[in-house]
Amino acid sequence: MTNFNVMLAHPVGKKEFDKDSFIQPKLDGVRCYITYHGAFSRNHKRFMNVQHILDELRPLFNKYPHVVLDGELYNHDYKDNFNKIISLVRKQLPSDADIEEAKAIQFHNYDIFMPDTPDNSFEYRNESIKNLHKEFTLQYCKTVETYQVQNDVTARLMYYQFTNKQGYEGAILRNNKPYEQKRSYNLQKYKEFHDTEATIIGWVEGQGKRTGTIGKFLARDADGNEFGMPVMDKMPVLTKMYDIAEWYIGKTATFTYFQRTPSGSYRHPLFKSIRNYE
């Protein structure tokens, strides 16, 4: 199975999660599914620099050729350096040195899909993952800690444990439902963002269906870092913003972001508003 579509999460809040759901830490890695045929991104691009992972999974896939392992290419030692993970796993023509360095990357396996029994609950799938890791000797493939939660209070306590104590970027809530090859409310993500200000110095037009609208603002923060902040809103609003884009130059914008990068830039910046309300 090489055309597999991974299950994607909605943000927590729009729909309540079920009682007796499961919670896992949210990893800041590169989404990856692995089959008998290789390792692939969520958009089906083959990863060419994870041969150490594929080699140790070969006995597993020889015995269970139809299963799909879902997870992330990650190493918690790089939890504050997402760009390092990217640089290691996305090389298409890796040198011997690249291959050796990439052995720092692990596959963190948090779900599994079995085409012959597609209606398996998450509880069953999670037990299957644990059993596979007992059956086979796996050094580079890791299970992801998983806990059952009965209510929102328990979920928030686990979120605090994952983020404040262990340094993960958030948490994932999973209803005890079958795997869905689409974005689903049976998979929800907790993730906190920060906000700050920067001066707008330019803009970029949207592409495709967003041609003729504002795509993102270019900005400079107080430390002189220049970056782009995408703009998300309804199409009429984005069109109006594009029509008066020149007006925004020099204005102070509030934007949200997840965290700072080692180089001082921003992870996931997003325009929020013009700070002209005080």
Regions found by a protein language model. Name each.
Residues 1-14:
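Phosphate/adenylate-binding "loop-and-lid" substructures adjacent to NTP/NAD/dNTP-binding pockets
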Residues 14-138, 277:
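Covalent nucleotidyltransferase
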Residues 22-24, 30-34, 40-71, 180-278:
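Classical nucleotidyltransferase
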Residues 73, 109-114, 145-148, 175-177, ...:
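Short, structured patches in soluble enzyme cores that scaffold and shape functional sites
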Residues 101-102, 164-165, 211:
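Extracellular/periplasmic catalytic domains that process cell-envelope and extracellular macromolecules
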Residues 131-141, 164-169, 225:
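Secondary-structure boundary elements
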Residues 143-194:
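Amphipathic alpha-helical
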